[in-house]
Amino acid sequence: MRLRAKWVLPVSAPPIANGVVEITGDTITAVGKLPGRCHDLGDVVLLPGLINAHCHFDYTRLPVPYRDSFADWIGDIVAAKAQQTPADYLAGIAAGMMLALLAGTTTVVNIECFPELITQLPSSPLRVIWCPELIDLIRPQELPAEPAGLAPHAPYTVSEELYRRCAQSGRFITTHVAESVEEDEMFRQGRGHLYEALRTRGRDMSDCGRVGPVELLHSYGVLGRNCLAVHANCLTAGDVRLLAETGTSVVHCPKTHRYFRRAPAPLPALLAAGVNLCLGTDSLASNDTLDMFAEMRELARVFPDWLPARIVEMATTNAAKALNQSTQLGRLAASAAADLIAVPVDGHTDPYTAVVFAEKPIAFMMMNGCQI
């Protein structure tokens, strides 16, 4: 099969006007100005399927108002989760997966609180990197035998021992870190709302009042090319340097960041240091959509001087790099997976701009060589 578009956007290579993508089975076999008969998609930009590098499908039906305290919000989430049945979670996860597909996402890194439910889900073409969420209360036997990745929740809910076990597994790791001022206060200063909330629940607080959470994870051996740090909002210059030197990737969730009314994220500093930056939606508990295009538009609003190409890379090639799947995902190139989407050009002369500001429905979608 050959697909022609007004613009073919490999992302890993320059845009191709009136380009063609050749597909055999589930794999891209050629990209360029290819001769011969093609299926013409028309006035669209054809690009790789988007990669959502951080999501919680479990929370699809758990919108939780923010009450100006991150610790209180977490407590509200825990209380809301306790009211859900397995059937509620299954319905929510399936609904979230459908929302992601409808928005042109083909791969999702999903943090899964209930990995035992995964096998009960209806089949979906969506490629999900299931990462069981780990805290010290979860028993090892509850985990799938071969999870795609591991998601130790955060430094305030995961012990040094559990973090070290995750790091020693050699698997892909994703973890929340340096997300809030309250978390920063807890670890650097040994005080604050989150500190008191966890202390009263009996948490061992001996890891607090010494170093920040990023430095703590580094001391546990967690940071590195297998690690995707989620949020990383409250960073010192030393934290930025550690993330860069270890090759740790960072995922930013622009609309969730706005929901919590946080100070601007340190993305320019991370970018200048060479940290691999990705994009995610987080969950519908802190967002009103699982649409990666909406995340790109929000990022462009906050950083209007950023080139659209950089933003698209965060949702494609950069995310694939974080997953150690650069040759397979996030690009249109020979031997890559045939995951493609098309968005209307909509009057834009630059294909990257057309993608970042796309608001019309996806014009075409293919996963593993099958049109969706």
Predicted regions and their residues:
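His/Asp/Glu-enriched, well-ordered alpha-helical/loop segment
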Residues: 220-222, 265-345
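N-terminal metal-binding scaffold of metallo-dependent hydrolase/deaminase domains
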Residues: 1-36, 325, 370
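C-terminal cap of metal-dependent C-N hydrolases
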Residues: 9, 337-372
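Alpha-helical scaffold segments that flank or form the walls of functional sites
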Residues: 22, 45, 61-124, 143
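Histidine/acidic-residue-rich catalytic or RNA/ligand-binding cores of hydrolases
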Residues: 181-195, 240, 244, 261-270, ...
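Active-site gating loops and adjacent loop-to-helix segments of metal-dependent hydrolytic enzymes
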Residues: 60-91, 180-224, 299
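Active-site metal-binding motif and surrounding structural segment of the metallo-beta-lactamase
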Residues: 33-47
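Histidine-centered catalytic micro-motifs
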Residues: 49-60, 172-182
